[in-house]
Curated annotation (Swiss-Prot):
The keyword Hydrolase applies. CDD domains: trimeric_dUTPase (cd07557). DCTP binds at residues 110-115, 128, 136-138, 171, 178, 182. It comes from the Bacteria. This is dCTP deaminase. InterPro entries: dCTP_deaminase, dUTPase-like_sf, dUTPase_trimeric. It comes from Yersinia enterocolitica serotype O:8 / biotype 1B (strain NCTC 13174 / 8081). The active site is at 138 (proton donor/acceptor). One of its GO terms (molecular function) is nucleotide binding. Pathway: Pyrimidine metabolism; dUMP biosynthesis; dUMP from dCTP (dUTP route): step 1/2. Residues 170-193 are annotated as: Disordered. HAMAP family: dCTP_deaminase.
């Protein structure tokens, strides 16, 4: 059962759930909290690799990832990031989120953006118990026109679901937590699997 708006506010008030900066009550709706787009992005570079063998040797996968991902792009205030049709890019939420060990979070895109062809998360929309950091967005433009994305715009909504008990292995306590504490648009670390 997902938390309703009153329960989300109570979890925030108690400090068990953290969203920084804390959203105003107007962005806590029914069963979700609206989140905004941050100013950090990463894109795939031109065809610098014919393919990435995801099950290949870790050093080869790592080298291929280095060749295909840009450095982090930090947009100055007031500028837009343009996502062209058929392009995939990474970005982050403006808000940093701290989820306790007995709660799981879910990120959904906004219907208004989906109707323009913008996918906010390609497949990874679960936010694990014990998560701390910004949420990386996997943008894909499936529409026909370029989309101008500006930091600070509403980009998605978070919902939260209590677990039957605290997780035995919450994300931030795991040694294999590849994205622990991320604050930027961290590229895939599949080579760390």
């Amino acid at each position: 059962m997902r938390l309703c708006d009153r329960d989300i506010e109570a979890w925030l008030d108690s400090g068990k759930l953290g969203i920084d900066p804390r959203p105003p009550v107007e962005r806590i709706n029914g069963a979700t909290v609206d989140v905004r787009l941050g100013n950090k992005f990463r894109v795939f570079l031109g065809h610098t690799a014919g393919f990435i063998d995801l099950s290949g040797p870790k050093d080869e996968v790592s080298a291929a990832l280095e060749r295909v991902m840009s450095d982090e792009i930090i947009l100055p205030e007031g500028e837009a990031f343009f996502l062209h049709p058929g392009e995939l890019a990474l970005a982050v939420t403006l808000e940093s989120v701290t989820i306790p060990d007995d709660l799981v979070g879910w990120l959904d895109g906004r219907s208004s953006l989906a109707r323009l062809g913008l996918m906010v998360h390609v497949t990874a929309h679960r936010i694990d118990p014990g998560w701390q950091g910004r949420i990386v967005l996997e943008f894909y433009n499936s529409g026909k026109l370029p989309l101008a994305l500006r930091p600070g715009m509403l980009i998605g909504a978070l919902s939260f679901e209590p677990l039957s008990g605290p997780a035995a292995r919450p994300y931030n306590s795991r040694q294999d937590a590849k994205y622990r504490g991320q604050q930027g648009a961290v590229a895939s670390r599949i080579d760390k699997d």
